[in-house]
Amino acid sequence: HRGITWPQRFHVTLCGEQRDSILEVNLTDSLCTLPLPFPVRYILPNTDGRGYGLFIPDSHTLPWLLAHWQETADDTAREALLMLLYENYQAKHFTDEEWSSSLLTGLSKEKNPLIASTIIGYLGNPLRTLAFEKKQEMEEAMFRLSETHAIPSCRIQLLRSLIQNATSDRSLQKLYSIWTNQSGKQLNERDYTTLAYILSLRMPEQSKTLLTTQRQRLKNPDRLREFDFISRAVTPDTLELDALFRSLMLAENRRIEPWTATALSYLNHPARESYSIKYIRPALEALLDVQRTGDIFFPKNWVNALLSQHRSPEAYREVEAFFAAHPDYPVLLKNKILQAAYPLYRANKQK
């Protein structure tokens, strides 16, 4: 709320008992008054997607829109309303359960691959934060859609989302079976390698079997070198994890930056969130050296790998303590840290 007005044009759709109408809004001031040409039940803002900002529907429209957005025939309007709802979800105007239910209902009917892809991208947030029973139901619904959805690209995206986000025993057993039998026909070698990494984190008792078998499946020498570098980050052996982290503090061990970022992200995976808090401060202290010795984009990738998966108050305090200890930290790097830590800060705003 900085008192800034963005002059802009966008459509507002008026939904009445007998008909709908689209009005063009020309927003030039902080307040814009529109005439209603007939009795209106629902007012849908920014249905052409051109508007910039958080559009908050009225308290009557928002729950109706959450239940009915997927019935919008026009693809552009449907995508725009989906994005509007996502922004209202981020603003905490409805619950994880309401949002996930709306997304899954929409996904089951969606015929546009781009909109389906947007929906699947949005599923990740509630998958992380839903209560256990509801999360398990959601995972099972996603598995069903990964086998039955009419859009092939949607089926593989769902499976990849489950690989990254599923945590229930039932889901992990399904994924383990897919990995063991290599039965996910849409999955490629990289997908199976990622699945082995994730299962090693989620099922530490199977880690040795997973990593040994997956390594035997790889034939390409470059992929074997990559595997040998990254797989050290998914072992349950904490001494190995700490040794790997210490090695990443040295520039010569960060030469292949995509591998480094992937390893750092697995070191800070949600499956070991409480353990990895101790990595936050030293990795932030190393950021200036990362900038000095690496590619121009590497500092951003480094802090994303380090912070983007953390949500705990302890992790939040580590970042705050770093800033308190470095009041004159370079602004560009500080902003990169804050951008990567945005989900962490959101999760701890009220705490």
Q: What positions do the PLM features span?
A:
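Non-catalytic accessory/interaction domains
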Residues: 1-226, 232-234, 238-241, 246-351
